[in-house]
């Protein structure tokens, strides 16, 4: 945000330099990102003087050029070749002398040099308005007041303004500081803390009066929730023209281009007081009535930029009896604005609902100075005041007459809010005690009203324009920023408490697992958390009512927050597959979002998605396709790398997978993985087999919290391996056999592995054969055959009892 130093001095007569003022504003929380020197005319018109045309004859070799003699006050007239049709003897004109730097339309500099034009020497240049950047006319040279003396500096004639412009990095909560008035309020409070007491000077409305009541326009507000306050007044017999130089300079200094006096005044009030205004051509208001209302969905409306827009049923509009004229608080319409022929206006000043304006602006892709302020919340109680200040300026600058009483529709006043400020809490949060009188002085300087003072604190009323100050902590922050962060002493003692609970740093675990997956040939992806609701029509597992929906989605593809990481992964896979990248292994860390009747939840996940071959063809080895068991191995290696074991395996029972497995520990789901349903894959035009794993990362991290690293000696005594084959039912899983075996012999059985699976001939229907290997070891002695046989017998008994297994 740009703030003019000269403009600030209209409110508060500071004697500090711009640099000192910038430092103070930064200390107050209005960070100055830069200070730039500003001159209202490029180059400051240096080298431009008033000249007196003594002679003007036809150029001997050019029909459209004149040869002139011009007195520039130094005693020796200059010969200047001029192409302007209006140059004549006796005129006073601006002359750019040799060595003067001028600027082209793109502000690029060029220098006046002595030279010849069609054989005749030219010792300078007689200038037009646009060549000096003080106007837009290029019809001819400027003709000045005949009373001016030759040699007078042209900058003195025009009135150049030199200024310094602050670039403020305004935080979103400081809506009250989005104007010169707002910044001046803070500056005054800061100066007061530095022992400088200055008056805050605000524009007076004492001269406001109604000239006549000949142009009454009725106002009706149909939606007071979206337009809590609406004011207006009519002004007639005004003349739309260029603004005076001082007003143009004010706007130029903050980067605005002057348009005409009426529009310039509304922009001036916006940046001076923070109140957006809008001027309607009164002759274009049908029915003599302004109606503030919403319109049916799909109503067409053409804005000032010539774009036809379809309105939403929630867009608040300013209408007459026949048509919409303006999107409230955002942008005007093409058919109701002020033009050069306008002689009467209806001037609007309002307070619109910030949320409504923000939604409308986003919906239509519009971002204006007005919407920027309305979205953040302006002062609802200066609406009429700002309107009156603007009306007075319309009288003085545009020659208008105030032709109606001010209409002010404000059915429910937005009240100031009250807070009790505790001295004890203030000292506790700041870290030291600030004198009570200093606290009261700071509050008063911030226009916070003191209602009552007790031994324990102060009862205060906070003005409505400070919508960011609603709690005691907010008030304490205000006191601290004005008192000065730099004045708070650093304590010589640092007190801290240390948690005894083992802390798992998520990012470190993610980094470890990400490195492991990268080593396995995976690539990390990062998908948008917003996704298309239509994806969820292909599964009954993820219910539409559990989706967190966006109130104002940018497109159909971004209308809900994802419940699953799957669909983003499939989008990425399909994108790559369409570019002939066939062997794909991807992973992503992210969050899913879930809507429940009484709350919303976020959960962390790690997703893996695999398609194609796990290896490529080489001269030594052919490529190998990925498989369910390849993905299972990746999942198990991740869990093993994290030190997680003892999980239980079971079948996935949802329609996301055509075949899949759940891994649980202590009845908490760690991961689910398997082959993605063809119905879902087909929606993304993927024909190959897709493998997907979904780690419930919150649960994985929770398991890590309880894991302790144990260090053991290298065993001195040998391991013993024994095998046997079991005849089992088809539904029995190896993981369940392994878990049962380890629970049967907890001390000596170190490892159980599956080394052969057989199904087919010579086996009963519904049966399969598993060949298992058992590693047995005693760390304190060598095992005897008798001890080993006893262990194997116990294992056989467990398998027979729990799984109905028989030895083959």
Q: Model-flagged regions — what are they?
A:
Residues 187, 191-221, 398-426, 432-433, ...:
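Terminal amphipathic helices with adjacent charged low-complexity linkers/tails
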Residues 5, 23, 27-28, 40, ...:
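Glycine/proline-enriched, intrinsically flexible loops and inter-domain linkers
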Residues 118-131, 137-143, 154-164, 291, ...:
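Mobile "lid/hinge" segments at catalytic clefts and subdomain interfaces of large enzymes
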Residues 1-211, 346, 365, 369, ...:
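Phosphate-backbone binding interfaces of nucleic-acid-interacting proteins
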Residues 49-79, 260, 266-335:
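Conserved mixed alpha/beta core segments that line enzyme active sites in large multi-domain catalysts
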Residues 419-423, 427-582, 775-777, 787-808:
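Extended, well-folded interaction surfaces typified by the phenylalanyl-tRNA synthetase beta subunit core
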Residues 2, 445-448, 468, 472, ...:
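A carboxyl-terminal module marker
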Residues 2-7, 162-171, 228-236, 369-376, ...:
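Short, hydrophobic beta-strand segments
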């Amino acid at each position: 945000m740009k703030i003019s130093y000269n403009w600030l001095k209209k409110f508060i007569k500071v004697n500090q330099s711009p640099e000192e003022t910038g430092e103070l504003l930064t200390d107050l929380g209005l960070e100055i990102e830069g200070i730039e020197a500003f001159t209202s005319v490029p180059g400051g018109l240096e080298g431009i003087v008033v000249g007196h045309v003594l002679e003007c004859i036809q150029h001997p070799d050019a029909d459209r050029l004149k040869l002139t003699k011009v007195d520039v006050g130094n005693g020796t007239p200059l010969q200047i070749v001029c192409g302007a049709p209006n140059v004549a003897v006796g005129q006073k004109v601006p002359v750019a002398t040799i060595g003067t730097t001028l600027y082209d339309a793109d502000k690029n500099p060029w220098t006046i040099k002595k030279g010849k034009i069609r054989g005749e020497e030219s010792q300078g240049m007689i200038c037009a308005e646009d060549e000096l950047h003080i106007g837009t006319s290029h019809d001819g040279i400027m003709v000045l007041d005949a009373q001016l003396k030759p040699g007078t500096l042209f900058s003195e004639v025009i009135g150049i303004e030199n200024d310094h412009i602050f670039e403020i990095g305004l935080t979103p909560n400081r809506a009250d500081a989005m104007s010169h008035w707002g910044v001046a309020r803070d500056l005054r409070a800061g100066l007061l803390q530095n022992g400088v007491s200055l008056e805050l000077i605000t524009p007076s409305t004492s001269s406001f009066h109604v000239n006549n009541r000949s142009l009454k326009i009725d106002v009706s507000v149909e939606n007071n929730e979206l337009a809590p306050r609406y004011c207006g007044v009519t002004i007639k017999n005004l003349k739309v023209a260029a603004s005076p130089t001082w007003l143009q300079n004010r706007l130029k200094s903050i980067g605005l281009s002057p348009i005409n006096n009426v529009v310039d005044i509304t922009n001036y009030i916006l940046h001076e007081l923070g109140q957006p205004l809008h001027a309607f051509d009164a002759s274009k208001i049908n029915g003599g009535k302004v109606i503030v209302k919403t319109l049916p969905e799909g109503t067409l409306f053409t804005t000032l930029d010539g774009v036809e827009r379809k309105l939403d049923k929630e867009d608040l509009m300013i209408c007459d009896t026949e048509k919409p004229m303006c999107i409230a608080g955002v942008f005007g319409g093409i058919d109701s604005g002020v033009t050069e022929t306008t002689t009467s206006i209806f001037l609007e000043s309002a307070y619109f609902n910030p949320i409504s304006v923000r939604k409308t602006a986003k919906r239509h892709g519009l971002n204006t100075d007005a919407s920027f302020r309305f979205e953040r919340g302006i002062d609802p109680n200066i609406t009429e005041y700002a309107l009156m200040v603007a009306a007075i300026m319309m009288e003085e600058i545009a020659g208008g007459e105030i032709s109606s009483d001010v209409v002010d529709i404000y059915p429910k006043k937005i009240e100031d809010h009250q807070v009790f400020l505790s001295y004890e809490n203030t000292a506790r949060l700041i870290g030291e005690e600030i004198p009570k009188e200093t606290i009261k002085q700071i509050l008063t300087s911030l226009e916070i009203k003191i209602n009552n003072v007790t031994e324990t604190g102060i009862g205060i009323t906070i003005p409505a324009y400070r919508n960011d100050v609603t709690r005691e902590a907010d008030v304490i922050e205000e006191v601290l920023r004005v008192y000065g962060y730099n004045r708070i002493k650093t304590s010589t003692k640092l007190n801290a408490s240390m948690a005894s609970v083992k802390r798992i740093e998520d990012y470190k675990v993610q980094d470890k697992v990400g490195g492991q997956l990268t080593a396995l040939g995976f690539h990390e992806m990062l998908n948008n958390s917003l996704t298309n609701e239509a994806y969820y029509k292909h599964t009954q597992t993820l219910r539409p009512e559990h989706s967190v929906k966006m109130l104002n989605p940018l497109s159909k593809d971004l209308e809900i927050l994802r419940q699953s990481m799957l669909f983003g992964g499939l989008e990425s896979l399909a994108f790559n597959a369409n570019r002939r990248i066939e062997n794909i292994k991807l992973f992503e860390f992210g969050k899913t979002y879930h809507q429940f009747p009484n709350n919303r939840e976020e959960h962390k996940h790690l997703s893996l998605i695999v398609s194609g071959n796990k290896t490529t063809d080489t001269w030594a080895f052919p490529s190998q396709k990925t498989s369910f068991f390849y993905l299972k191995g990746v999942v198990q290696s991740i869990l093993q790398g994290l030190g997680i074991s003892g999980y239980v395996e079971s079948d996935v029972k949802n329609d996301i997978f055509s075949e899949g497995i759940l891994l649980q520990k202590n009845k908490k789901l760690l991961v689910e993985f398997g082959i993605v349903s063809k119905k879902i894959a087909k929606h993304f035009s993927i024909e190959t087999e897709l493998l997907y794993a979904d780690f419930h990362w919150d649960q994985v991290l929770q398991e890590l919290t309880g894991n302790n690293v144990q260090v053991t000696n290298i065993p001195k005594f040998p391991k013993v391996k024994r095998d046997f084959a079991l005849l089992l039912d088809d539904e029995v899983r190896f993981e369940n056999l392994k878990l049962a075996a380890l629970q049967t012999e907890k001390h000596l059985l170190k490892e159980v592995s599956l080394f052969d699976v057989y199904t087919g001939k010579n086996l009963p229907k519904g049966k399969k054969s598993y060949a298992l290997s058992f590693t047995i070891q005693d760390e304190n002695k060598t095992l005897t055959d008798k001890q080993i046989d006893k262990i194997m017998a116990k294992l056989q008994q467990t398998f027979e009892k729990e799984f109905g297994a028989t030895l083959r």
